[in-house]
A protein has these predicted regions:
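Key DNA-contacting residues within the recognition helix of helix-turn-helix
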Residues: 15, 40-41, 50, 69
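Short, charged recognition helix plus adjacent turn
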Residues: 4, 69-78
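Short alpha-helical DNA-recognition segment
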Residues: 22-41
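Residue-level detection of the helix-turn-helix DNA-binding "recognition helix"
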Residues: 19, 33, 44-46, 73
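DNA major-groove recognition helix of helix-turn-helix/homeodomain DNA-binding modules
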Residues: 52-67
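A short, Lys/Arg-rich alpha-helix, primarily the initiator
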Residues: 1-20
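Alpha-helical residues within the helix-turn-helix
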Residues: 19, 30, 59
Length: 78
């Protein structure tokens, strides 16, 4: 059995959403309750948002929390 690996795509989603909505790092951070520096680090994949932020981010980004993850390799049906 091959175990799948997961790649978090939250960085791309945040950056695209911010750009499409003409929001600054500071404005987007304010929507979630974090600093502009935190958002910048998320977008650059320096670090990831705490799991407690994922449901709120999903609502803001109009997606599900599952959309933040992509499965690579393995059999997703196993």
């Amino acid at each position: 059995m091959t175990m799948p690996t997961y790649h978090i795509t939250i960085a791309e989603k945040i950056k695209v959403y911010r750009n499409e909505n003409n929001l600054s790092l500071k404005e987007f951070g304010k929507l979630i309750g974090v600093s502009a520096q935190a958002v910048c680090k998320w977008e650059q994949n320096i670090c990831y948002p705490d799991i407690i932020f994922l449901p709120h981010l999903a609502r803001i980004l109009n997606c599900t929390t599952d959309d933040f993850f992509e499965i690579h390799g393995g059999d997703a049906n196993e």
